[in-house]
Amino acid sequence: MEDRFSAITNLHGDHKQAIFGVYVGHGGVKAAEFAAKNLDKNIVEEVVDATFLKEEGFKGGSSCVTALVSEGSLVVSNAGDCRAVMSVGEMMNGKELKPREDMLIRFTLWRIQGSLVVPRGIGDAQLKKWVIAEPETKISRVEHDHEFLILASHGLWDKVSNQEAVDIARPFCLRTEKPLLLAACKKLVDLSASRGSFDDISVMLIPLRQFV
């Protein structure tokens, strides 16, 4: 299992500030573990990347997707092949919050130096000429019709579409009683696995209305 995650709520003592992340290691788990433990402390991506590369004996790299909620703003950043999808309003739209960078790489290099598909990520010292740590970032205001956010690794999105994920998670997330977030995550993981995903599958669900 090379996936890791982090969730820090009540950031700086403010219940409306939080940071969440899903991290997917490749070539080992060290980079994913390092990012999960340090990214909240060093929001600027170069700090984490440069610090990791200095760690003796650390190899491999990590893709990641993070969501920072602060002062009513939602900052979603992605480096690699993870993805963030938001459920918006009564129309239940599954809105992806990152460019499909994996599609760009498929039509250019396919694999970087024969070993890596994604052009962004943390670590990968031997591929630093081609792999950058700077994430794709989208900033938006948290609105009343923003229901929940799904952060997940490629293991989910390889087999489950944005809209499918939203449709499956929504009944669990918007219950009038206590939301069943863990059950929703398990449902999504099981669906991807049943369709033949052999990747590690990590899913995180974040209710957004608490941050409005």
Swiss-Prot record:
Source species taxonomy: Eukaryota, Viridiplantae, Streptophyta, Embryophyta, Tracheophyta
- Residues noted as binding Mn(2+) in the record, renumbered to the chain: D199
Report the superkingdom from the record: Eukaryota
* This enzyme's EC code(s): 3.1.3.16
What catalytic activity is recorded? O-phospho-L-seryl-[protein] + H2O = L-seryl-[protein] + phosphate; O-phospho-L-threonyl-[protein] + H2O = L-threonyl-[protein] + phosphate
Name of the protein this chain belongs to:
Putative protein phosphatase 2C 53
The PPM-type phosphatase domain covers which part of the protein?
1-208
What the record says about family reads: Belongs to the PP2C family.
The GO molecular function terms of this record are: metal ion binding; protein serine/threonine phosphatase activity
Which keywords has UniProt assigned to this entry? Hydrolase, Magnesium, Manganese, Metal-binding, Protein phosphatase
- A Pfam family it matches: PP2C
Cofactors that this protein relies on: Mg(2+); Mn(2+)
CDD domains named among the record's database cross-references: PP2Cc
